[in-house]
Amino acid sequence: MIIRDSDFVFRPPPQLSWARRVLIKPCAGHTLPYPVTTSARLLDNIIRGIREISNADILIADGTPTGESIYPIYKSLGYDFHHVLMLDVRDSIFIEVENPLTQFYAVESFWVPNVVLRSDFLISVSPFKVRGDSGRFSVANLLSLLPVSKYQGEEPGGWSTLYELGIEKVLADLYFTLPFDLGVIEARQKLFYTDDDDPTKGDVEDYGRILVGEPHEADFEASQIAGVETEHLRLISEGRDQLEDQMDS
């Protein structure tokens, strides 16, 4: 679903009304504001929409690529919401979760923060970012939930061991292992940057839209808008067929 930004009011799906704990995962790994990170304005819109139908606990959680505290970044981005618990994933207990795909692409299991597993409804909220020829939307946004301490290589920080496996394959595996209920893509602006993985050096285009939907479907629509064929989304489509075959066998 694509909605004009000026008209956007977050209307949660009916199943959220049953949730006792809702986790919102923004893109908050940089101190720079939108479109590099998720805006406080959109998060506030989503929180207000949840409050309209639910008294659930609302949590916001993310982690930094350096493994340092994320709380100073939350503050710099203006993330100050009433009755919302702000969390740094590095403080979580991490539990190893098996990939449900028997023929996984790169990773057989992931270390996942327990706060995700203990939440009833999961929302990934990302900017509209395109890195080279691949979209970095709501599915790719999940990467920073993983512990840097377990996935960094010889150099401190980041998830270099996962990048070495092929990040597009890793993101497809992560989608199935960490299934989020909803993806929200903040496409008021579109940010395009090159393969050096530095979104602060990208080019920005105005677009004025918000995309909402199941994460793979919302991301696929965003990729079409961007004119790119995002590899991990293609792999997810194949993985869905594999899961159906597993269930039928």
Enumerate the predicted regions with their spans.
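N-terminal and secondary-structure boundary signal
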Residues: M1-S249
